[in-house]
């Protein structure tokens, strides 16, 4: 249990929905910063594949518990919930990064390849949570094949 009174939480966040949205917002900012730092010295043409190295390291970390967005959104039925808005923003961020990276890599169809890499990422995270980090390594192998054409 948190050492905080419910009234204090509502005073700070306004509602339970805003508390959940604030949690996801923090998680997305942290993830973006981690990814950007990890890829900073990688040429844009190699970032899509290098991203999967980051995924493998994350899945192998002792703190790995899967994707906070997937966990949280799976519990929300309201499409307008503020946490869903945060989650959709993060998904759009990933999609745009993959489009940038696949374009820089010179693949034949960067948009379709970017969508496929998002699916691989989703599977890597969900699979690693259930089966262990080998699933992230499998996704990296598949990403390499996909990017090679």
Each language-model region and where it sits:
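An amphipathic alpha-helix signature
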Residues: 32, 49, 92-99, 140, ...
């Amino acid at each position: 249990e948190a050492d905080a009174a419910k009234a204090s939480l509502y005073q700070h966040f306004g509602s339970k929905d805003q508390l959940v949205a604030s949690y996801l917002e923090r998680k997305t900012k942290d993830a973006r910063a981690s990814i950007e730092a990890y890829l900073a010295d990688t040429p844009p043409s190699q970032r899509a594949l290098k991203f999967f190295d980051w995924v493998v390291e994350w899945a192998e970390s002792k703190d790995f518990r899967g994707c906070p967005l997937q966990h949280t959104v799976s519990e929300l039925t309201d499409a307008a919930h503020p946490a869903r808005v945060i989650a959709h923003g993060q998904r759009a961020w990933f999609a745009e990064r993959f489009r940038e990276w696949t374009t820089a890599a010179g693949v034949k169809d960067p948009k379709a390849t970017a969508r496929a890499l998002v699916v691989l990422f989703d599977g890597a995270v969900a699979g690693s949570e259930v089966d262990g980090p080998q699933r992230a390594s499998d996704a990296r192998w598949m990403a390499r094949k996909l990017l090679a054409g």
